[in-house]
Amino acid sequence: MTDYKNTLNLPETGFPMRGDLAKREPDMLKNWYDKNLYQKVREASKGKKTFILHDGPPYANGTLHLGHAVNKILKDIIMKSKTALGFDTPYVPGWDCHGLPIELKVEGLVGKPNEKISAAEFRQACRDYAKEQVEGQKADFIRMGVLGDWDNPYLTMNFETEAEIIRTLGKVIQNGHLYKGSKPVHWCLDCASSLAEAEVEYEDKVSPSIYVRFAAVSAAEVEEKFNALGKGQGALSAVIWTTTPWTLPSNRAIAVNAELEYQLVQLGNERVILATELVQTVQNALGIEQIQILGSAKGGDLELIRFNHPFYDFSVPMILGDHVTVDGGTGLVHTAPDHGQDDFVVSKKYGLEMAGLVANDGKFISSTPFFAGKGVFEANDLVLEKLKETGALLKLERIKHSYPHCWRHKTPIIFRATPQWFIGMETQDLRIKALSEIKSVRWIPSWGEARIDKMVANRPDWCISRQRTWGVPMTMFVHNETEELHPRTLELLEDIAKRVEKAGIQAWWDLDPAELLGEEAKTYHKVPDTLDVWFDSGSTYASVVEQRPEFNGKSTDMYLEGSDQHRGWFMSSLMLSTATNNKAPYKQVLTHGFTVDEKGRKMSKSLGNVIVPSEVWNKNGADILRLWVASTDYTGEIAVSHKILNSAGDTYRRIRNTARFLLANLNGFDPKNDLVNPEEMISLDRWAVSCALEAQNEIKEAYDNYQFHTVVQRLMRFCSIEMGSFYLDIIKDRQYTTKADSLARRSCQTALWHISEALVRWIAPILSFTADEIWGYLPKLDNRAEFVFTEEFYDGLFGLDESDKLDDTYWQQLLKVRAEVNRVLEQARNDKLIGAGLEAKVTVYASEEIRPLLEQLGNELRFVLITSQVVVKPLSKADVAESELTGLAVKVERADGEKCPRCWHFATDIGSNKEHSHICGRCIENVEGNGEQRQFA
């Protein structure tokens, strides 16, 4: 028997079936950077509308975790998809390089500044350490396939950037937003420095929970206010509740709410003042069975009544404050202006001075009675003993509650009033302006707007000064006596900025004030503080975006970070940009959630659920990591596990297999010579291209709306359903068995070529390495760009002509018919009636609505159903039972005739040609004749 294998057009491609990404990706990366891919993308986009995504700088310390990978990959997907959508997308990655975490690391390496080494040497060690960390993180970001100007990133420690940060401080001063004051700030005892809101984490802590008596100076005065003269018996006290006994030495008042009702209550053998709504709660907490209400009064009537401090020899007033609620406690609030924001504000209204009892190290100063030299948390028990001694302790318990901790040391922090520099939220209407600007920004997801709006509405003034060594200095001079800024501050700041531009921040520390101030140097001194690192990163809209030539003076389109940055970078950037430019620094803000395991738990070493990004790309490849990120709805928590990554691998294989099938069947196709005009193409091929156009429109829209999981879902629908289980299955017979240069085959290859050109661009933003690999295997074109990343989405797709009878509705109906036929064929296979579908003869009983659709294809219906023979008959009650598709019934029999060894179809004409006695007439026509003619499929 003749071997007809060499008469078939078998698929062939060098594109491997296995991705082997972990091995291949590094070689591709080398090629990208050897050939300056990023610059090629920039050159190809020259003159197009700019889209600027400003990179929020990660901290230059430690190895990258999955959260970093999610963030950078999302940014990269956006930048690559925006390029494909026709934008110029310069991307300048950056790093945050100053601040405490680096100081602590360097202290561990070289010791504290001014101990083993000088402050100048310490700063240089910090700079060297940060640089080393940047290089390590940079290599990992590049390995993820993230494109950007990695040779010229921005670092907040670059001399030019440090200078611009100082200039931004100058604008803040110029616009009247900076002031110095003693206010309570978050204070870390281990850092010996104030902390920003974003540097505070809340963890559970066990604290004493105490009810404390403040005895009335004049019981008669209180009785009169409550209209209870002579009522009740025993001592009369105001009762407060607190979980911070150590703040009681600093108590200077008791706050009540003017609008709340209070009652004088007989509790056993004493009388106490409580908010009416909390009497029952306190009674239960104290375990007292019977009480008596002696009188009532509004909080406003109790103003300025005095009560004795529980263990010091002075009295404190009762004052009014809106912050007092009945959410807990007693409705009377212990007020220590040094140690609480509300306490400070309300005390200021009454002219109450701060106590100033706690030093920088968290210990009570030497003049503090009873507690001198004791640490605040150590003093808790001592205060309790003192309260017991004076009879002021009404009740003591221990409770577990949420308490602020230092993000770095994981230790409890305190509120402490210290002299600091602040950006005032009310000065020059900064809060009002910022709230207005929030409304002009597109927040993705939309709930981000309400979140940051609430934070801005309620945030205190921003303490921007820090008592650190490694940071941008607050390069100001203040008067020795008045503490006022030098009148030429703005001019001096610019002079210092120019020096910093040349020599870095050390120029300030080395500066002799006399160089700039002359004789005035005797009456002015340098401010010793550094700027909050959130000021560094928050001012990058000015120090980076406004300075880099590739941004061309354009404002930023998007900030994209984790949802914790509403109170971090988004907030600091909004505050500074509004303070200096009267506008938000961004047009859109996109946030993503945090990574958790498949059970929704945080990643932690103790749970053993930590997945390191490098593990993923070393085992699976970076494209799998990228596909996992794109497949997830990033607006909520982002689940990851080895099982989930394996699932991403399955999705990847489906896409890769589709691409491989396309490439293999483009074997021998030259677009310059073999392309078929749309109107000459076979109907099914035209439909396949129109499917690709519809998919592309949806994919472009999803990319434009940053809905990458929708992109992946649409890709899978296209690859698996529209192509894999329908079109690509049907065309195999035509591809392999018709004449190599026939219209039937070239029409199909034309469709596959258009689809390949589109598909490779669809996946490029997500599966960057795989897209680059596919690009190299596509049929050669004289004008083909070297890299897919310089290209826009494919513009060669076309829809069905309006005059085309076999429109999308028609083919969608055929899809349903084919699915039903496949179901019945599967049943016949299970019943051992047939093996492969080509062993079947199918009779389709169709309703009057469906039958004309099937008959339109004539003899080509069998190619769509992938059976050897098909008969279409009218549906009647006498026929076999209707199928799951209304208006259709299917009957399966074994096909007539013999199996053709060339096309595998069963035919009754095998042996009718003596020269080719083993193959069917159709194959003889394709081997010897002019080739079979196809019109529809």
Swiss-Prot record:
Placement of sequence motif 'HIGH' region: 58-68
What SUPFAM superfamilies does its record include?
Anticodon-binding domain of a subclass of class I aminoacyl-tRNA synthetases, Nucleotidylyl transferase, ValRS/IleRS/LeuRS editing domain
Intracellular or extracellular location(s): Cytoplasm
Q: Which PROSITE patterns does UniProt cross-reference here?
A: AA_TRNA_LIGASE_I
Q: Which UniProt keywords apply?
A: Aminoacyl-tRNA synthetase, ATP-binding, Cytoplasm, Ligase, Metal-binding, Nucleotide-binding, Protein biosynthesis, Zinc
Can you provide one Gene Ontology molecular function annotated for this UniProt record? ATP binding
What's its catalytic activity?
tRNA(Ile) + L-isoleucine + ATP = L-isoleucyl-tRNA(Ile) + AMP + diphosphate
- Residues annotated for L-isoleucyl-5'-AMP binding in this entry: E561
Q: What residues bind Zn(2+), as annotated?
A: C900, C903, C920, C923
- Family matches, as Pfam families: Anticodon_1 (PF08264), tRNA-synt_1 (PF00133), zf-FPG_IleRS (PF06827)
Q: Which residues bind ATP?
A: K605
Q: What class of enzyme is it?
A: ligase
Q: What EC number(s) does its UniProt record assign?
A: 6.1.1.5
Q: Can you list the GO cellular component terms from the UniProt entry? A: cytosol
Which free-text remark accompanies the cofactor? Answer: Binds 1 zinc ion per subunit.
Q: Which cofactor does it need?
A: Zn(2+)
Function summary: Catalyzes the attachment of isoleucine to tRNA(Ile). As IleRS can inadvertently accommodate and process structurally similar amino acids such as valine, to avoid such errors it has two additional distinct tRNA(Ile)-dependent editing activities. One activity is designated as 'pretransfer' editing and involves the hydrolysis of activated Val-AMP. The other activity is designated 'posttransfer' editing and involves deacylation of mischarged Val-tRNA(Ile).
Subunit and interaction comment: Monomer.
Protein name per its UniProtKB record: Isoleucine--tRNA ligase
Organism field? Histophilus somni (strain 129Pt) (Haemophilus somnus)
